[in-house]
């Protein structure tokens, strides 16, 4: 058992050393990511049928200072955690599962029932409907909800990084082209 614990600790340490950081100009927000290349599974997705995805925009509102959780995925785009709905799950279950897969953070499905839902149909695929639930929380334990406490393996090859970022800082670093947001997240930010 001791050997296993030591192996897990060393594995996490090695993965932490591979992490890169993006800081906002003020230094108050840090996004952690890796340059590891993902080998995404080729999903046989029919563009002929209607499909649904779901996710959560987790917004922390601490002393009138709003921060949002964003993850990095395909094409190094950053955005709210979301993904394809499986046939055996509800939209809320899908949203909760995707947050765990992309950030390691667990959100109870029952706490999402009263959340406002944002519906987005992307221009590139009119047969896809994305449901995002706005989830406001008063504070977050950044120590337990940080990349430092995750192995890359924990992210299920769905994410190459994540972080909490102040909405003002996010606006500044996207204008400076330090990071690039996906179209869904740009849409959501206009609704917050």
From Swiss-Prot:
GO terms for biological process: AMP biosynthetic process; ATP biosynthetic process. Mg(2+) binds at residues 98, 102, 158. GO terms for molecular function: bis(5'-nucleosyl)-tetraphosphatase (asymmetrical) activity; metal ion binding. A motif (Nudix box) lies at residues 83-104. Its cofactor is Mg(2+); Mn(2+). The keyword Ubl conjugation does not apply. Keywords: Hydrolase, Magnesium, Manganese, Metal-binding. Its EC number is 3.6.1.-. Gene3D superfamilies: Nucleoside Triphosphate Pyrophosphohydrolase. Residues 49-187 form the Nudix hydrolase domain. The keyword Protein biosynthesis does not apply. InterPro entries: NUDIX_hydrolase-like_dom_sf, NUDIX_hydrolase_CS, NUDIX_hydrolase_dom, Nudix_hydrolase_domain. It comes from the Viruses. Belongs to the Nudix hydrolase family. This is Putative hydrolase 414L.
């Amino acid at each position: 058992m001791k050997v296993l614990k030591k192996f897990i600790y060393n594995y996490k340490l090695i993965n932490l050393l591979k992490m890169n950081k993006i800081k906002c100009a003020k230094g108050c927000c840090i996004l952690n990511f890796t340059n590891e290349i993902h080998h995404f599974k080729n999903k046989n997705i029919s563009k002929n049928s209607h499909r649904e995805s779901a996710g959560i925009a987790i917004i922390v509102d601490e002393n009138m200072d709003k921060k949002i959780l964003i993850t990095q995925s395909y094409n190094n785009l950053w955005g709210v955690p979301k993904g394809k709905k499986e046939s055996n799950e509800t939209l809320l279950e899908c949203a909760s599962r995707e947050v765990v897969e992309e950030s390691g953070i667990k959100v109870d499905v029952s706490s999402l029932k009263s959340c406002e839902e944002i519906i987005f149909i992307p221009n590139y695929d009119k047969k896809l409907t994305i449901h995002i639930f706005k989830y406001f929380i008063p504070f977050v334990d950044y120590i337990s909800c940080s990349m430092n406490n995750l192995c890359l393996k924990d992210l299920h090859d769905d994410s190459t990084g994540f972080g909490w970022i102040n909405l003002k800082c996010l606006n500044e670093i996207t204008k400076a082209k330090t990071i690039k947001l996906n179209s869904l997240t740009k849409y959501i930010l206009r609704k917050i």
